[in-house]
Amino acid sequence: MGRGKVELKRIENKISRQVTFAKRRNGLLKKAYELSLLCDAEVALIIFSGRGRLFEFSSSSCMYKTLERYRSCNYNSQDAAAPENEINYQEYLKLKTRVEFLQTTQRNILGEDLGPLSMKELEQLENQIEVSLKQIRSRKNQALLDQLFDLKSKEQQLQDLNKDLRKKLQETSAENVLHMSWQDGGGHSGSSTVLADQPHHHQGLLHPHPDQGDHSLQIGYHHPHAHHHQAYMDHLSNEAADMVAHHPNEHIPSGWI
């Protein structure tokens, strides 16, 4: 018993409509392939689904060649030169076809819409993905090596800087220790020791100057703390002057002022 005739109208059920589209699309693509193979015909088939997805078949090596041949076959021979807007429209169609083809390829790479693909097309897609993965891994490894090299260079720079800072710190610490030792030993309790070690100098520290008639004190040895002695002597002179001012009738030894 043969199949009954199918009423040619839009299928309202969405799932049934998609199933019917897939079956008839595959059949149409198969017929186009058989026609080109059996009859040596140049066949180009372009199908857009209800959701705008592109399905195409071309018996030639490139769909664009067939489309260009179709465009050149102008049915109106009297109008050989197409208007500019027609040329632009044809260019738009080419670009649109190219974009839709790339979108379909992208979906296939993402694992979508693989149903219409044949075994050979699936193998080609698999090989393409494997090649892409190899290139991605190679680039990733190279980026990691470059990053590791940069980190090692920065580490070496930081080590050199740390070495210089440590050296400067040691030099500064040595200078501070020497300075503190000098202050503790020579600035406070060590002044007498320094003077005792140099008797031929400190004997003239409090010796009166020979050119002066009075007995004013003179500093004959320039010690690092000589300004402390000078300040002390100035203090004594000021006290003597105050005593003369407050007690003018009392006798003050001449060596005090």
From Swiss-Prot:
Protein role: Probable transcription factor involved in the development of floral organs. Required for the formation of inner floral organs (lodicules, stamens and carpels, or whorls 2, 3 and 4) and the lemma and palea (whorl 1), which are grass floral organs analogous to sepals. May be involved in the control of flowering time. Seems to act as transcriptional activator. May act upstream of the auxin-responsive protein GH3.8.
PROSITE patterns, alphabetized: K_BOX, MADS_BOX_1, MADS_BOX_2
Subcellular location(s) of the protein: Nucleus
Protein name, entry field: MADS-box transcription factor 1
Top-rank lineage group of the source organism: Eukaryota
Keywords tagged on the record: Activator, Developmental protein, Differentiation, DNA-binding, Flowering, Nucleus, Transcription, Transcription regulation
Keyword Transcription regulation among UniProt keywords: yes
